């Protein structure tokens, strides 16, 4: 359909195209797209057994359809959820999607538009995925408070070890000593010298 003159891409032509090949949705003019047409494209590709049909969300401008795809993905292929979320257009992503995604995969915090990144959502993200949620960048430093790193420490051993050196505060180190005493014992270098040598919540406990 990409070789058809834009003027000739009527609703009928577009529907026939996506019924034959769901990925033709990419060539449908934005003003011709409807929720029904987008669902038809998804249905076509799913019918072919195409495991990547959810990637069509990159061509879907409707919140409700993208949300349907996310819910279906959660039920049938939860391991693909992050990849599908990445493909959703930033202007389509909204608070409802953010609050759906973060308890399932905290890494999604880094792909949210900045206006959707809030302290509460960062909290949920690190409770879900620890440092994996915020260690890849994409989250404003102003939201990465000391409490966020304490939550990362509490998440898991793996998350604890990913905490940047500069963020290993007395509170983080105390959490490590409390939850994973063997790490602190066997890897004393985990605790910065500045924390070991000062009177703090870490040294006084």
Label the model's feature ranges.
Residues 1-205:
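Non-catalytic tandem-repeat scaffold regions and their flanking low-complexity/translocation tails
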């Amino acid at each position: 359909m990409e070789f058809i003159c834009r003027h000739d891409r009527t609703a009928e032509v577009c529907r026939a195209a996506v019924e034959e090949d769901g990925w033709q949705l990419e060539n449908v003019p934005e003003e011709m797209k409807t929720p029904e047409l987008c669902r038809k494209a998804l249905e076509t590709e799913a019918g072919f057994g195409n495991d990547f049909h959810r990637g069509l969300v990159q061509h879907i401008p409707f919140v409700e359809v993208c949300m349907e795809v996310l819910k279906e993905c959660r039920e049938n292929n939860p391991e693909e959820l992050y990849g599908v979320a990445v493909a959703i257009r930033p202007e389509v992503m909204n608070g409802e999607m953010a609050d759906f995604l973060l308890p399932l995969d905290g890494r999604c915090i880094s792909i949210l538009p900045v206006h959707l990144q809030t302290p509460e959502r960062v909290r949920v993200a690190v409770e879900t995925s620890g440092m994996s949620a915020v260690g890849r960048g994409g989250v404003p430093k102003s939201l990465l408070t000391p409490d966020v790193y304490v939550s990362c420490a509490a998440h898991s051993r793996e998350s604890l070890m990913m905490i940047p050196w500069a963020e290993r505060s007395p509170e983080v180190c105390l959490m490590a000593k409390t939850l994973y005493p063997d790490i602190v014992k066997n890897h004393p270098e985990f605790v910065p010298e500045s924390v070991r040598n000062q009177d703090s919540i870490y040294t006084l406990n």
